[in-house]
Amino acid sequence: MRGVKLPRLVPSRPVPPPPAAPGEVLAAAGGLRVHLGGRPVLDGVDVEVRAGEVLALVGPNGAGKSTLLGALAADVPAAEGVVRVHGRPVSDWSAPELALRRAVLPQSASLSFPFAVEEVVRMGRAPWAGGDRADEDEAAVAEAMARTEVAGFAGRPFSALSGGERARVALARVLAQRAPLLLLDEPTAALDLRHQELVLRLCRERARAGDAVVVVLHDLALAAAYADRVALLRSGRIAAGGPPSEVFAQGLLSEVYDQPVEVFPHPRTGALLVVPHRSP
């Protein structure tokens, strides 16, 4: 209409979430049911993810661990129940707002173009473009590459890396994002012993710094050593939840995994060790 001045649409600047208090719930699922391919995958799951803690999702193949992680990330829709991030249903957040609040590491990472390692890590800074923290980009990228030990091949094409190297670059991207909620799906799966320990130490460090970390693990000894709490899944439900010392009971694990196991403390550290029972 002539004479009417229309408002200029200016993209909003990213606003970071306020610092979380220790123990604050940064993500939660209540009565969560998820169907994939017409079949139920999660059935009535309740879980909370708290600032300052590492929560490990464990359980046999097909138990629903990755699906639960995807639901907490707002990447997998709920058929019933609610998923909240920073106190609000995930549907209330826009994609850019979610990207400031949670960072996600999928099981596998692949790229169609020959991006260099540093370019891949820099992708983690995309949510902050145009915001007050954009000036942190260089430091965030450099720190993430150093912590994951990928700085030595920063210029190499991502597609030319080994599986373990790709996994560490993908983790560096997540760390560079500097979101207060980290959702990591099997981050140690392709790694050697040394780098498995490196990744879990980074998880603990992020939790000590006040972040909330959710990690899907198959190695129960790693979960016992590094997680504050574990959620043991079986057939789409949480069979038990709590500190590893409470959940990792020999009888329960043997039943859930349908495999006899032995649980005993490490003779020096006291950390729980879980090993399959083997006949002599």
UniProtKB/Swiss-Prot annotation:
GO molecular function terms listed in the Swiss-Prot or TrEMBL record: ATP binding; ATP hydrolysis activity
EC number, as in UniProt: 7.6.2.-
Principal subcellular localisation of the protein: membrane
SMART domains membership: AAA
Binding-site residues, ATP: G59, P60, N61, G62, A63, G64, K65, S66
Record localization: Cell membrane
Keywords annotated in UniProt: ATP-binding, Cell membrane, Membrane, Nucleotide-binding, Translocase, Transport
Keyword Membrane: yes
Enzyme category, top tier: translocase
Record-annotated ABC transporter domain positions: 26-260
Function: Part of the ABC transporter complex HmuTUV involved in hemin import. Responsible for energy coupling to the transport system.
Cited PANTHER family: HEMIN IMPORT ATP-BINDING PROTEIN HMUV (PTHR42794:SF1)
Family statement: Belongs to the ABC transporter superfamily. Heme (hemin) importer (TC 3.A.1.14.5) family.
Protein name (Swiss-Prot/TrEMBL): Hemin import ATP-binding protein HmuV
Originating species: Streptomyces coelicolor (strain ATCC BAA-471 / A3(2) / M145)
Lineage: Bacteria, Bacillati, Actinomycetota, Actinomycetes, Kitasatosporales
Originating gene: hmuV
